[in-house]
Amino acid sequence: MGGETIRDILDNGKARLNGQERLVLQPNGGEYPLRHWLMHNGYRIVGEELLHENRFYYEIIVAEPTGPVSYTEQQLYFGPLQLLARSPAFVAKWQRLLQQKQKTLASFEKARQSVPEEKVHGIAREIQWITQLLT
């Protein structure tokens, strides 16, 4: 299940959360919106793990309610604890995604129909962040 779906389930079930729970989440993509929801709902990310099996990456996020917490855009994008640990799987994942995003940006330039500038700028920003991360 993707991070957006997990976020929506958590948001719709807020009344059932008692403020004492530890959330152990495994989004298949969409980690940014899930981390964003956690931050805006007072959950601190206390554990992150990235596993690589076959050709897939699996991310596990553990969060606990702590009250207000603040993360930068890059921390939300990469994972605050992942940024600190920079495991071999983490570096490999972002090297792979950098290549994919560069191909995407190049295909935008060749597209017959114009791509919204917002989308182009978003991909370019992500490429910049990943490049900075890997250097």
Task: Annotate each predicted stretch with a short phrase.
Residues 66, 70-135:
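An accessory alpha-helical subdomain
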Residues 9-13, 54-58, 75-87:
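Short, surface-exposed, charge-dense and proline/glycine-enriched linear segments
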Residues 1-11:
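Ordered, amphipathic secondary-structure segments that act as subunit-interaction surfaces
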Residues 10-61:
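C-terminal substrate-binding/active-site "lid" region of AdoMet-derived donor-dependent transferases
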